[in-house]
């Protein structure tokens, strides 16, 4: 029987325009308000047999607020951004423009001294493919948007450059149905958000 792994994007901890690499900040008031607003649509996922989350404070808080009581999975951590950790993309670009350009152009490169995009996607995909087959049924995982993008690129076997074209919004949900390297994408009830947020 195939698995159904539903990814829920963690609520935000800042304006989406101020997102930082490997952001360890807790949910802000806007994030908490968004969780409360989205909870009617996302609470039913608490019935999943297995409930996981990334180790970030906002992933754990989102999962707890939705009643998932998730188990932290280190493999669902955000991409290791090395010396760019805590910076916005604009800040990294201002400090090291050629390194950022190289990182965006080459998924195998890690000019920041951390993890390459290729290694990050492989790590997240490895977690996805090692879900035990006898755990058939429902799995929910609260994670950072970057982790969900990595899971989608891996599962759908699309070009790595597709990663940059996926826009995973806070508290959106998407499901992957399948197992062992054969996955299908299913869109869940994604909460509409005002444009420009």
Describe the residue ranges of each PLM region.
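GST superfamily/GST-like fold recognition
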Residues: 145-149, 178
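Active-site-proximal alpha-helix that buttresses catalytic centers in soluble enzyme cores
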Residues: 2-71, 113
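Generic structural signal for well-ordered alpha-helical scaffold segments
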Residues: 36-43, 121, 125-133
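Acidic, low-complexity terminal tails and accessory targeting/binding regions
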Residues: 1-4, 73, 79-91, 153-197
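Short beta-strand scaffold positions
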Residues: 53-54, 122, 142-143
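Generic beta-sheet signal
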Residues: 5, 49, 135-146
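Phosphate-handling substructures
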Residues: 26, 66-125, 165, 187
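Conserved histidine-centered catalytic loops in small-molecule metabolism enzymes
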Residues: 45-75, 101, 177-197
């Amino acid at each position: 029987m195939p698995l159904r792994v539903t990814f829920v994007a963690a609520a935000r901890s800042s304006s989406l325009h101020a997102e930082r690499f490997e952001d360890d900040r807790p949910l802000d008031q806007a994030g908490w308000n968004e969780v409360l607003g989205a909870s009617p649509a996302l609470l039913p996922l608490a019935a999943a047999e297995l409930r996981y989350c990334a180790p970030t404070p906002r992933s754990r808080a989102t999962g707890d607020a939705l009643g998932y009581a998730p188990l932290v999975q280190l493999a669902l951590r955000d991409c290791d951004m090395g010396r760019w950790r805590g910076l916005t993309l604009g800040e990294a670009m201002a400090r090291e423009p050629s390194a950022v350009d190289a990182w965006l152009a080459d998924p195998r490169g890690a000019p920041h001294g951390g993890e390459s995009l290729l290694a990050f996607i492989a790590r997240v995909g490895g977690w996805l493919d090692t879900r035990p087959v006898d755990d058939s049924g429902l799995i929910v995982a609260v994670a950072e948007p970057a982790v969900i993008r990595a899971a989608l690129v891996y599962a759908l076997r699309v070009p790595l450059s597709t990663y940059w074209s996926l826009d995973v919004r806070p508290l959106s949900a998407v499901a992957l149905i399948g197992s062992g390297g054969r996955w299908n994408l299913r869109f869940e009830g994604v909460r509409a958000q005002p444009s420009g947020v």
